[in-house]
Amino acid sequence: ACATHPPMTKSRKVLVTGGAGYIGSHAVLALKDAGHLPVVVDILTTGFGWAVPDDVPFYEGDISDGDLVARIFHEQGVEAIMHFAGSIIVPESVENPLKYYRNNTANSRSLIESAVTAGVKHFIFSSTAATYGLPEESPVREDTPQIPINPYGLSKLMTEYMLRDVAAVHDFNYCALRYFNVAGADPQGRTGQSTAGATHLIKVAVEAALGKRGHVGVFGTD
């Protein structure tokens, strides 16, 4: 889901939230390889400092800290945001929904407000296919109804709604990426899926094939 998001045709300073995590660290490398200038902010709850290249500015902190984010914008001249920070485990979101509404929804609201205040106009949001819930059609399309069935999906969908509404009234454009099963690693071995106990399907299947876990849990019949 995108709202008038232009291609980055010139080198830009891009703030990558969660840039020490799995997807975020790959985005940092992709930005560098494309000639852009990434800046990372990560609280290192699940990310790793070693995943951030030495030549990339790194701030350890929470995106809900408006003063920190404003300082990053000022010091680095940030022009765009790629927002990967958040919590992603579906069963945990059911057991602890408030954690997800804080980390994924409330913190995203703070980041969006900081961006609007600073005049940062370009925002790419790491959403999730969980916003679709149990879709009645396959393959799923971008305009398939979004009816999440767990707090994780809903916490991400609410952020999409915030971005939509902000873009309608401010000089602000965004794109929301709704992943299904993320897999893979940097071909040069610079980063990869390193989180202990990760729940990504492909990693779980590979670990089962290698004998590192006893089974792969299958949910649903498709």
Question: Which ranges hold each PLM region?
Answer:
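SDR active-site strand-loop-helix element
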Residues: T17, V41, I81-A85, F123-T128, ...
